Amino acid sequence: MLSCSSFLIFFLFSWVLLPMKSFAIPIISLDKVRLAINDGASEQLPVVIWHGLGDTPTSFTLTEVSQRVQKLTKGAVYAIRVGDNEFEDIKAGYLGKLEDQLDEVCDLIGNEDSLSNGFYALGLSQGGLFLRALAQTCDAAKIRSLITLGSPHSGINTIPGCSPTNLICKAVVHSILGLGIWHSWIQNHVVQAQYYRTEKQYDKYLENNKFLTHLNNEVLHDNYTRNIEKLKELDNLVAVSFERDDIVEPPYSTGFGWINETTGENIEMEDFVLYESLGLKDLVNQGKLETISFPGRHLQMRWGDFDALVLKYFKDEKEEKTELEESTRPSNFLSTYFVSPLVSAIDGTVDYLHGKSLFPEKRNFKELTMRKRSIVTPEDSEEVYPYISEFVAASNVSEEKGPKSFANLAFITIFSHFFYHIDDMWRSTLGLFSLIPQIIGIIYLTVMFTGRELDTFMQFGGQVVNEFINYVVKVSLKYPRPADIEYGVGYGMPSSHSQFMGFFSAYMIAWDYKYRRSQCFSMLSFAKYAIYLTLSTFVCSSRYLLDFHYLTQVVYGYMIGFGVGLFWVYLVGKLRSLGVTKWLLSLPPLQFFYIKDTIPHSKDNHKRQWLESKQFKNQKSN
C-alpha cells in the first residue's frame, strides 16, 4: 500500500485535473504470467492474483510473486489489472465504485475458458478483500482455495496512514474522516471509503456504506443467505495476518477480528459479529477457515513460508520436491576473475575477525534469517506452524530471500525506498537518513550539468561502477537480509547504501590528498572530512537499526566502497597522466557541451571565479 500522500495526489489529479472521461468504468483484464514451462499442457488449476493498493501486476514484486507461484504449482497464473495501463490500474485502487469493478472482473472470468473448471486465488492486501467479494457474489468465480495476505476483511477505521512528520497529510485525512467519509459521492468513488468502518459512528456506517455492510452481512439484504452459502463452497479460506501490520488499521481486521475502539483491546474473530453473520463459525467447524499470523509488518514474510502456503493450498498434486530456478548469475569472466577472489577475501576476513573475537557475532546467515525476532526454523516450526514444516521439508525450497532481477536491484540500489513508520518519529528519522545517498546523487547531477567538469563526471562514473560491483557481489554471495526486512527486497551482503557512502567518503578524502595535498591538513579540510564521515555514520546506522541489514553487511559494504573509492582516485589520476582525459575532451560530444577539466589543475577555483565575477560587476557599474 502507498502512503496517504499518494492517496491525496491521485485523488486530486484524477478527479480535478484529468478529463471527464475518467468517470467511465475502467477496462479490466487478466494478464497471464508466462514462463519457460508448458503451462498449457498442465492439468493443474490456475491461480488468479489480485494485487494491493498502489501496486500493479507488472511491478517488480508482483511479477516475482506471480512467477514464483507458477514455478511452484507448474500451472497458469493470471493477475487482475483494472485499466488499460499501469497508471489506470493504480488509480482504480484508489478511485472507483467497487461493485462496478467486481462486476467487470466477474464477466471477464466467466469469459476465460481456462478458469471455467475452477481456480485458486491469492489476494494481497485489499486485493484479498476483493477476491472474497468475488467468491461471494460472482457465480463464474469458482474459487477452490483463497489465500489473503494482510487483507482488511472486517474493514479499516482509518485511511492508510501518513508519516508522523507529514502534518498536512494528517490534517487532510482528519478532515475527510470527520466531515465527508459518509457522503454518497465519497462512498461511491473512493475505494478505501467503501470498506471504512468505525463503531464510533456505527449507525452512519450501517446507513451509508453499501459495500462492506452487505459483503459482511452486517445489515439485512437480498443476498444475505447467498453470501454465507457461497463462502461454504470454498475448500479453504486462509486469512494471513501480520502482528505488526502498520498499514491495515486495526490489524486484527485481517483475521476477521476487530478492536475495541474505546479500550484498544483486541476482539478475536470468535467474539466479533462476522463470526455469526457471515457463517465463519460453520467454516471453522468444517475445517475450511484458517487464520495464520506472522510476526512481521504488512506483507512481510519469508519466501519459505510463502512457498509453504502455496504448496499446501494451491498445488493439485503434492510432489516430493519442488525446486525454483536460480537467479541470473554473473558471467563466467566476472565470476572467475573478480567475484570469486572478492568473495573469498570477504569470507576469509570474516573468519579472521571472528577468530580475533572482533566480530563474535559471525553468523550463519540462513539460520539467522529463520530465527531472528521469532521467525521459526523448520525444526521448531512444527510447534508453532505445524502445517508449514511438512511442506518446507517436502519442497526443499530455499529459505533465502528470493532473487531479484537486475532492474529491480538497480532501482532499489540507486533510488531505493523506505517505509514510513506510523507514530514512530525515531524510525521515520532513521528512514530519512537512508535517503542521504539519493540527495548526494541529486547533487552529483546538479554539479555535472552546471559545472561541466570532467572530473565530476569521472567521480559519478565511479559511483555507478561501485553500484554494479555491489550488485555482482550480492547475487554471488546470496546472503539474505534480516527476517524483519519488508517482503521481497533482495539480498543483503553487502549493503549498497553503506558501499555508496564508503566510496563517496574515500573519493572525496583521497582526491583532496592527491590534488590539494598542501591544504588537506588544514582545519577546514578536517571539518569537511568530519562531515563526510558523519553522513556515512548516519546512513550506515540507519540501515542496521531499521533492520535492513545485519551489522556485518553494513561494515563490509562500507569497507568495499571505501576500497573502490581509493582505487578510483588512483585510476582517474593514471588516466589523466596517460593523456586519456585530454583525448576525451577532444571528442566532439564533450566539446559541444563545453566539458572541461580545470578543477585538478587550479587551486582556489571557486574563489578565483568569485573574484572575477566581482571585478566584472565593478567594471560594468563604472
Swiss-Prot record:
Proteolytically cleaved, possibly by krp1. Keywords: Disulfide bond, Endoplasmic reticulum, Glycoprotein, Hydrolase, Membrane, Signal, Transmembrane, Transmembrane helix, Vacuole. Residues 25-405, 450-488, 541-552 are lumenal. GO terms for biological process: membrane lipid biosynthetic process; protein N-linked glycosylation. Glycans are attached at residues 223, 260, 396. It is an enzyme of class 3 (hydrolase). It is a multi-pass membrane protein. One of its GO terms (cellular component) is vacuole. The record marks 373 as: Crucial for post-translational processing. Residues 427-428, 512-519, 574-622 are cytoplasmic. Disruption phenotype: Cells show lethality and the dolichyldiphosphatase domain alone can rescue the lethal phenotype, but the growth rate of these cells is slower than in wild-type cells. Cells containing wild-type palmitoyl-protein thioesterase (PPT) and inactivated dolichyldiphosphatase reverse the growth retardation phenotype. Cells containing no functional copy of palmitoyl-protein thioesterase are viable, but abnormally sensitive to sodium orthovanadate and elevated external pH. CDD domains: PAP2_dolichyldiphosphatase. The active site is at residues 125, 245, 298. In the N-terminal section; belongs to the palmitoyl-protein thioesterase family. In the C-terminal section; belongs to the dolichyldiphosphatase family. This is Palmitoyl-protein thioesterase-dolichyl pyrophosphate phosphatase fusion 1. It comes from Schizosaccharomyces pombe (strain 972 / ATCC 24843) (Fission yeast). The lineage of its organism: Eukaryota, Fungi, Dikarya, Ascomycota, Taphrinomycotina.
